[in-house]
């Protein structure tokens, strides 16, 4: 049972995988050990490791009662609790680390720009096509940029306050599990050293707004950054959705989106006076003045899903699926291609239908 012990050691050291699906665990093991393992063996290992952790937490104390022991070892016990998947509400919210952009020479190549995926309400056909494109261009990719609302955070939605979620029974942990699976699937086609960024959108900001309530903050829910293990995955994270941005090349900004007007691309360029790309509105637009351009690149969600029942028919009629590819050259100049998506989730790029 050597393979079983290998999997168990992996799960003991990376307990976040205990909350992930078997496919995500198999991919993590493949990257770590260069070996493939059956889902049945992974399932058995997860069960045994979870039982180990439960047993460790429930061992009887011989010398003093539980309350005295916890007081005597409060910091040690707090850390133990925060590192187990069975006490997610005890996690403290971390602030993202300061982000440093790669040098221009390390950015030269292809950058994938996605946003408004709204996982688990994403367009599955579109996601599959994007992964196929990434597979074909894997060694050209220098940046993978998630521009906000990758996670829908439907369980914290104000649209559903005091009501069932769009999918009855949906929990925040289930949403994070779905996000982790999608991230695993995308990341298998990213080369080592790829620059990965994650911007919060107004949907991830639902967690920030939730935590501003004093009663909620007493038993905090996992943040998107923690629930998706973003920093552990190597993403540079920014969590102030209406303020934050990343700069690609010399001066091309990417952010979630600020303005929601009919001609929002012009509004962004008028106010920011720099070339940029954003999502947020679920629309596709572009506006150019001289050497500056603003691109609203659409979204990657399934707009027919129950999560968008709040939107009126005229509002949905303006929405479009899309994403973008930005080629950075040696001078740091951006050359952006907007990808328009067909109603069935397919799209064309490089003379091929994905």
Task: Tell where the protein language model's regions lie, with residue ranges.
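Short, amphipathic alpha-helical "recognition" segments used to contact nucleic acids or chromatin
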Residues: 1-20
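Flexible, charged surface loops at secondary-structure boundaries
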Residues: 104-107, 135-140, 190-192, 230, ...
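Short, basic interhelical loop/turn and adjoining N-cap
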Residues: 18, 27-51
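Core catalytic region of metal-dependent phosphoesterases/phosphodiesterases
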Residues: 98-99, 114, 119-231
């Amino acid at each position: 049972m050597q393979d079983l012990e290998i999997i168990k050691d992996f799960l003991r050291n990376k307990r976040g995988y205990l909350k992930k699906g078997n496919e995500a665990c198999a991919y993590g093991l493949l990257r770590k050990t260069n070996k493939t393992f059956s889902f049945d063996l992974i399932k058995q290992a997860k069960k045994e490791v979870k039982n180990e952790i439960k047993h460790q937490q429930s061992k009887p104390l011989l010398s003093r009662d539980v309350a005295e022991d916890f007081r005597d070892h409060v910091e040690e016990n707090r850390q133990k609790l925060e590192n187990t998947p069975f006490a997610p509400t005890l996690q403290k919210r971390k602030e993202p680390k300061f982000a440093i952009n790669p040098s221009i020479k390390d950015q030269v190549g292809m950058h994938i720009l996605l946003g408004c995926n709204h996982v688990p309400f994403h367009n599955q056909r579109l996601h599959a096509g994007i992964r196929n494109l990434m597979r074909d261009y894997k060694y050209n990719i220098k940046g993978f940029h998630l521009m906000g609302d990758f996670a829908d955070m439907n369980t914290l939605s104000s649209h559903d306050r005091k009501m069932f979620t769009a999918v009855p029974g949906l929990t925040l942990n289930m949403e994070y599990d779905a996000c982790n699976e999608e991230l695993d699937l995308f990341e298998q086609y990213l080369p080592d050293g790829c620059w990965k960024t994650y911007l919060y959108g107004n949907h991830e900001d639902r967690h920030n707004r939730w935590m501003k309530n004093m009663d909620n903050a007493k038993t905090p829910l996992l943040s998107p950054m923690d629930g998706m293990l973003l920093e552990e995955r190597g993403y540079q994270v920014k969590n102030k959705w209406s303020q934050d941005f990343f700069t690609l090349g010399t001066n091309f900004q990417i952010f979630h989106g600020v303005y929601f007007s009919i001609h929002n691309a012009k509004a962004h360029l008028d106010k920011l006076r720099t070339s940029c790309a954003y999502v947020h509105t679920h629309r596709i637009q572009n506006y150019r003045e001289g050497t500056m351009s603003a691109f609203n690149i659409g979204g990657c969600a399934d707009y027919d899903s129950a999560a968008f029942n709040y939107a009126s028919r005229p509002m949905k009629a303006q929405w479009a699926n899309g994403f973008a590819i930005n080629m950075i050259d040696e001078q740091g100049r951006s050359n952006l291609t907007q990808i328009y998506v067909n109603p069935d989730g397919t799209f064309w790029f490089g003379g091929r239908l994905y």
